[in-house]
């Protein structure tokens, strides 16, 4: 039997191996294999995890949210949902996990990022990777061919988390989609309009929406001489141009993916171009692209899209970018990405941009699930709210802005001891009328402490009840900000609070 010191040495060696693979970004299968070996070794050595010191923390790539953070998130959601409803959307929900077969074959290389669950009653299940594939399954199951919907829920991805940039292993995704047969590019333009409305309303800084089309990409690769079998892998290289230089991308395509240098150079002539509708018109006259049917169809749709964007007054926020090459296997036509542009705040800092939303047209997804292969044209957007939350939180911290974590409108306070439940009755009266009210759960609270509590939590009004007020049938209503006090008859209290807080006459 090996000594405890030797056992610990072997275990530490295995731990270092697993950590090294993760740092090198090895394949998920290789990491899982080494983790399985490590767990097996622990079992063989009788390694008791319970004897080790337990560290109380959230799992890597996850976090808790404080009341202050949740208040910020709710305000962001209010802006987003208000916009969706303004555009006539309905809301749906789907299970947090799907049959594994439903998700497989929809995400290309990203399939390795899907969380699989243990076998449950003979069904192989996986946590949802996004909200779009479940939506496609929902449409096919219910034989729906026309709907405008939004869905806000968590998705799960075994990715490398970047907490400071709002990238987590489980994150909230906000989707808005339009399914149905409509005139070309009108739903696409509305999706772009919605994203611009939301980002402008949130006031999180400058942003730019990049657009391209999968048909233009495929046509471009074809005329450049890229073999069909390499379309998707070359696509993933091109999409890195927002992070690295063209030379690095070219070296990857030639050195790692076996593309001929002259083919890579032809691709480079195209993908380094970006601009407005004039670039679309220029490419329609391109001697090579103009001979490719897919590219011409994509360019024609983009030209029409820019006409609607001009009509909607958002064309100045849109850029046609040929390097935009991302997209999952079910994406078909126009693709879009919204990026936030954060300018440097100090000397030596570089400007950076971060994706906060994307669009996609996926006309063939529903047909993958429909027994008869019937297609339902779909276009939609996804908003990366986790990144938006991070930016809003950082902005509020920098401004030292106070955030209210409750919506209490009035605190019912007592001025003396033993008031025979007068403050409780007043609070019940307010609750029954739909007023957001609270009182402190203490028998003899000091009035000064109650007023201080209002200042700390941002409660705007205090309803003060004392012995004299009870005798006179009035309640003293105090403004916390101005410290102005006025006597209000008990039967008029609800109306006076509503007037001061601009609350409508209905119960929340």
UniProtKB/Swiss-Prot annotation:
Q: What is its EC number?
A: 6.1.1.21
GO molecular function annotation: ATP binding; histidine-tRNA ligase activity; protein homodimerization activity; RNA binding
Which residues make up the binding site for L-histidine?
A: 130-132, 157, 177, 326, 330-331
Which transformation does this protein catalyse, written as a reaction? tRNA(His) + L-histidine + ATP = L-histidyl-tRNA(His) + AMP + diphosphate + H(+)
- InterPro entries per UniProt: aa-tRNA-synth_II/BPL/LPL, Anticodon-bd, Anticodon-bd_dom_sf, HisRS-like_core, HisRS/HisZ, HisRS_anticodon, uS15_NS1_RNA-bd_sf, WHEP-TRS_dom
Q: Which SMART domains match?
A: WHEP-TRS
Q: List the disulfide bonds.
A: none
| Gene3D superfamilies per UniProt | Anticodon-binding domain, Bira Bifunctional Protein, Domain 2, S15/NS1, RNA-binding
Write down any Gene Ontology CC term: cytosol
Which keywords has UniProt assigned to this entry? Answer: Aminoacyl-tRNA synthetase, ATP-binding, Cytoplasm, Ligase, Nucleotide-binding, Phosphoprotein, Protein biosynthesis
Q: Which residues form the WHEP-TRS domain?
A: 3-59
Q: Does the keyword Iron-sulfur apply?
A: no
Q: What class of enzyme is it?
A: ligase
Residues annotated with Phosphoserine modification? 66
Mainly localized where? cytoplasm
Q: Where in the cell is it found?
A: Cytoplasm
Set out the biological process GO terms recorded for this chain's protein: histidyl-tRNA aminoacylation; mitochondrial translation
Asked whether the UniProt record includes Flavoprotein among its keywords, one would answer: no
Similarity comment: Belongs to the class-II aminoacyl-tRNA synthetase family.
Description of how the protein assembles with itself and partners:
Homodimer.
* Functional summary from the UniProt entry: Catalyzes the ATP-dependent ligation of histidine to the 3'-end of its cognate tRNA, via the formation of an aminoacyl-adenylate intermediate (His-AMP). Plays a role in axon guidance.
- Protein name (database record): Histidine--tRNA ligase, cytoplasmic
Per the UniProt entry, what species is this protein from, by scientific name? Mesocricetus auratus
Mind giving the lineage of the organism this protein is from? Eukaryota, Metazoa, Chordata, Craniata, Vertebrata
């Amino acid at each position: 039997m090996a000594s405890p010191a030797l056992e610990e040495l072997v275990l530490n060696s295995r731990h270092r191996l697993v950590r090294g693979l993760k740092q090198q970004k090895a394949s998920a299968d290789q990491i899982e294999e080494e983790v399985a070996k490590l767990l097996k070794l622990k079992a063989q050595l009788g390694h008791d995890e319970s004897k080790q010191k337990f560290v109380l923390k959230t799992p890597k790539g996850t976090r808790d949210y404080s009341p202050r953070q949740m208040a910020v998130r709710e305000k962001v959601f209010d802006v987003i949902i208000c916009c969706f409803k303004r555009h006539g959307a309905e809301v749906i929900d789907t299970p947090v996990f799907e049959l594994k077969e439903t998700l497989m074959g929809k995400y290309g290389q990203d399939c390795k990022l899907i969380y699989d669950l243990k076998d449950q009653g003979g069904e192989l299940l996986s946590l949802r990777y996004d909200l779009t594939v479940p939506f496609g399954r929902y449409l096919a199951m219910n034989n729906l061919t026309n709907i405008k919907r939004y869905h806000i829920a968590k998705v799960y991805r075994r990715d490398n988390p970047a907490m400071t940039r709002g990238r987590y292993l489980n994150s909230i995704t906000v989707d808005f989609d339009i399914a149905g047969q409509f005139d070309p590019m009108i739903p696409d333009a509305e999706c772009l309009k919605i994203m611009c409305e939301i980002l402008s309303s949130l006031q999180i800084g400058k942003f730019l929406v990049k657009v391209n089309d999968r048909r233009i990409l495929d046509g471009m690769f074809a005329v450049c001489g890229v073999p069909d079998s390499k379309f998707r892998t070359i696509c993933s290289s091109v999409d890195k141009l927002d992070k690295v230089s063209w030379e690095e991308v070219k070296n990857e395509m030639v050195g790692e993916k076996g593309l001929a240098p002259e083919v890579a150079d032809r691709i480079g002539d195209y993908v380094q171009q970006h601009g407005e509708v004039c670039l679309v018109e220029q490419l329609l006259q391109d001697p090579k692209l103009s001979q490719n049917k897919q590219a011409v169809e994509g360019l024609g749709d983009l030209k029409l899209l820019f006409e609607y964007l001009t009509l909607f007054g958002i064309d100045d926020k849109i850029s046609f970018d040929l390097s935009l090459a991302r997209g999952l296997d079910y994406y078909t036509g126009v693709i879009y990405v919204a990026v936030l542009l954060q300018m440097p705040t100090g000397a030596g800092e570089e400007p950076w941009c971060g994706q906060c939303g994307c669009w996609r047209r996926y006309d063939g997804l529903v047909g993958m699930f429909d027994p008869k292969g019937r297609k339902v044209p779909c276009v939609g957007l996804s908003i990366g709210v986790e990144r938006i939350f991070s930016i809003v939180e950082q902005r509020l911290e920098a401004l030292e802005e106070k955030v209210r974590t409750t919506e209490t409108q009035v605190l019912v306070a007592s001025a003396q001891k033993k008031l025979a439940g007068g403050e409780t009755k007043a609070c019940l009266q307010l609750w029954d009328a739909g007023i957001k009210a609270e009182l402190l759960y203490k028998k003899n609270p000091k009035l000064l402490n109650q007023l201080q509590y209002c200042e700390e939590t941002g409660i705007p009004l205090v309803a003060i009840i004392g012995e004299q007020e009870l005798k006179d049938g009035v309640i003293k209503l105090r403004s916390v900000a101005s410290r102005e006090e006025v006597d209000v008859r008990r039967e008029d209290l609800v109306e006076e609070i509503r007037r001061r807080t601009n609350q409508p006459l209905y119960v929340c």
